Amino acid sequence: MFINTMSPSKLKTYNECKKKYQFKYVDYLRGIYNVNSNTDALQYGSYVHKIFELGTELETLEELENLAGDLRPNYKFSSIKEKNLSLILENFFEFNKKLEETISNEMIFKIDVTDDYSINGIIDRVIKGKSGNYLVIDYKTSRRPTPKTELFTDPQMLMYAYAVAKQFKVPIDKVTVAHYYPHLDKLVSVCYGRAQVSVFLRGLKNKIWEIRKKRKTDLKASQNQWCNWCQYKDLCPEF
């Protein structure tokens, strides 16, 4: 099976369920095939991300609140999701003031790892400090923060760290990656070493070759905790 690029979402999908990977990245099905699907969390997360993307240069909380109001009609989710919105905006506004130079919002990257594969994705925000260090921020609206121990092995953040190090030509230990939880005003951050990233990239190459060796008929469904939220559930042979 042909594959020459890997993204965090592609890797996550493959690890969760091979059949879901087939539907999304082999058959390219983009619709929602789940009559019970609830997209509130996805829509709300996209809404908050868009506020943060467009609001980094705003100088007052009122401007940020007005931006949120202007964007709201573009997203469909239950009004109950908005109960913490004022707190989220206040926390982000104060957090944002403390940050140094924003190099990029929604940074699209594609970085060659070897001659035959690359990694690609979109990073919420990249900050450059006066010392020349970089901070990669991934905004999160999930209820509970990811423990730092899990962040140390998070494939998404490892890819982001490698991409920023390559893009801006700095050592990997000059890049800090972090989840920011605006409802908690909590930043969970880690910094990776060269050896750790090298081990991860070797594992990623092995995963790519695993996928390359598979035929479409090898991609089987896996019943797990994500099934009820899967956009392809009604197509799945397990249901």
Regions inferred by a protein language model and the residue ranges of each:
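A non-catalytic, helix-rich entry segment at domain boundaries
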Residues: Q43-I108, D112
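Accessory terminal regions of nucleic-acid processing enzymes
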Residues: S131, K205-F239
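Nuclease catalytic cores
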Residues: N4, P8-T60, L85-S86, S104-M107
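Surface-exposed helix-capping loop/turn segments at secondary-structure junctions
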Residues: E57-E63, K166-D173, I211-S222
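A residue-level signal for conserved active-site and pocket-lining positions in enzyme catalytic cores
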Residues: C17, V48-H49, R125, Y160, ...
